Amino acid sequence: MDIALMKNMIKAGVHFGHQTRYWNPKMKPFIFGIKNKVHIINLEKTLPLFRLAINELKKTIKFNGKILFVGTKRSASAAIKSIALSCNQFYVNHRWLGGMLTNWKTVRQSINKLKDLEKQSLDGTFDKLTKKEVLLRIRLLNKLENSLGGIKNMGGLPDAIFIIDTAYEHIAIREANHLGIPVFAIVDTNSSPDGVNYIIPGNDDAIRSINLYLNILSDELSKCYKEKKESIILKNRLKEQ
C-alpha cells in the first residue's frame, strides 16, 4: 500500500517543494535534496507522518469529534469542500474571517442570521417584501453562505482543524493554537511548521498534489464515518430487542 501510495505521490508531484531561495530552514528535516534549484521533499518522511495524521483524524470522527477543513486559495477550494461533505464534516473554502474561531460568539450570531434568511427564502417571507428588499436580503444571504455555509451546522468549535498551506492560512492556525485545537497541515518547503501539531510535508500548490492528499483522506474518513454510523444503528437495534 505504501509503495503504491509513494508512486502515486511522485506522479502527483507531492515531492516538489519551492525554489531554494524561498525555503524555510525549519523544513530542513523533511528535505531530501535539491534538483534544478528546487527543494525535493523526502517522501519517506512524508508517508508515516501522513499515516499518523489519518489515524488521528479517524479517532476524532470515531469519538464524535468535529473536523474543520480549511483551504481558501483557488487550487484547494473545491477539493476542501468536497472532502468535508464526503465525511459529514465542515469547511472554510473562501476567505477566512478573522475571529472565526476565537470570536465564535459573534460568528454564531452571523450563522443564526444566515439560517433566518434561508428560512425567509422558503416560508414566503420574501413574497411580502419589495423587489429592492428581496434583492438586498438575497445578496446578504449569498454573502453569508459564501463565508459561513461550510460551518453553519458545526454547532460549536471544532475538535481538529486540517489546513492546506500554512503560510496562506496563518490566521486560522494562530486562532486554533490560541484555543488549543490540534492543527493538521500540508506544509511546503517555503512554509513554517510552527503551530502545526501534525505536519505533513508536501507540495501544497499543485492541484494534483492537493487532490491526492484529500482523496485519500476522503476515502479513509468517509469509511470511518460510515462504520461509526452503522455501529450506532446496530446498537440501537440491539437495545430494541
UniProtKB/Swiss-Prot annotation:
UniProt family annotation: Belongs to the universal ribosomal protein uS2 family.
Keyword entries, A-Z: Ribonucleoprotein, Ribosomal protein
MF terms in GO: structural constituent of ribosome
Protein name as catalogued: Small ribosomal subunit protein uS2
InterPro entries: Ribosomal_uS2 (IPR001865), Ribosomal_uS2_bac/mit/plastid (IPR005706), Ribosomal_uS2_CS (IPR018130), Ribosomal_uS2_flav_dom_sf (IPR023591)
GO biological process: translation
CDD domains: RPS2
SUPFAM superfamilies: Ribosomal protein S2
GO cellular component term, pick one: cytosolic small ribosomal subunit
